[in-house]
Amino acid sequence: MIKFLDLQKINEQYSQELKAAANDVIDSGWYLLGERVNNFENQLKNYCASKNAIAVGNGLDALRLILRGYIEMGIMKTGDEVIVPSNTYIASVLAISDNNLKPILVEPSYDSYNLDISKIEAAITKRTKAILIVHLYGQVCWSKQLEEIALKHNLKIIEDNAQAIGAEWNGIKTGNLGDAAGFSFYPGKNLGALGDSGAVTTNDDELSITIRALANYGSHKKYKNKYQGLNSRMDEIQAAFLSVKLKYIDDEKQIRRQIAERYNREIKNDKILLPNLPINPKEHVWHLYVIRIKDRENLQNYLSNNGVQTLIHYPIPPHKQDAYSEWAESSYPISEDLHNDVLSLPIGPVMEDDEIRKIIKILNEY
């Protein structure tokens, strides 16, 4: 079976460095809020060219903490609205509602599956305070029009950068496009930890200081709590692992691009709609390679029977989840269409040539 993503094989490439990093942490006797977290934060902010990076427990917390930070700073309050794509993983929406803010769903573009920026302005009200963009599947969601809308309406732009570390727009990396960005280092991400981890980047010093306290029980100084915070800290051992893997992220994203370009070049089946390649290849890091087909279940079973594992990102849109039953009667037809059709093919930095050839051959014979 060709795995959708072979995490063991990916991490095996760096096993000696990862084991050395683990031993270093064990021998140090310091497991939280130490030198390795500080080192990784510096490496991440330098990589993104951002002023600040704060390591946190996971990607959802990263987004939650950004919004909570703005609330503590008086920029947002209960009931304020945040525009968010209707076509996204539910974490993007949970971060908003968890802070007693109101998610306002906006449909995606068929071209990129990202938030349709041309539809944002119609969703803005007097209560709108931010736009939470998602660089879905690894493709940048950004434009001059987005910048102009945010400036015109005095809105914060928050990046959900869980899937697109290393992508660029006009020479600026994701994580440094908006006012703040949340990262996930879930093991399956392009930069994956060996457990849960996340981070926030921002050029706003006040927001950075506020988030750093909020993530540590609301405390700037031990036993003195300014906020009713939470416990969302990256472990030293995960920071050490991520410092090893960050060195290779650019090499790995180039391999992903080459596979995506090959799929687009060699898959020739009129029943399958392939993703668009961006004019500037740097705008996509191909966390996922997502095709569309009307008989998805049949194709997925066919691929499985022929030894190819695939996944669906995502089978149920947020507005159809039980968690948001208040949206049960809402209609977002583009999102629903995509969620019914999309199928993610294997793509990753350790795929063998014969695996890629096999997948292409099977799809062309379908």
Give names to the regions the model predicted.
Residues 8, 37-42, 47-54, 60, ...:
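PLP-dependent aminotransferase class I/II
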Residues 84, 105, 157-159, 202, ...:
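Hydrophobic residues in well-ordered beta-strands that form the structural core
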Residues 111-193, 199-201, 344:
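Active-site phosphate-binding strand-loop segment of PLP-dependent enzymes
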Residues 102-112, 311:
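Short beta-strand->loop structural element characteristic of the AMP-binding/adenylate-forming
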Residues 30, 34-81, 95-99, 105, ...:
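Phosphate-binding glycine-rich loop
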Residues 1-30, 35, 306:
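N-terminal "arm"/small-domain region of PLP-dependent enzymes with the aminotransferase-like
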Residues 99, 152-153, 306:
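Helix C-cap/helix->beta junction micro-motif
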Residues 87-93:
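Conserved coil-to-alpha-helix start sites within the AMP-binding
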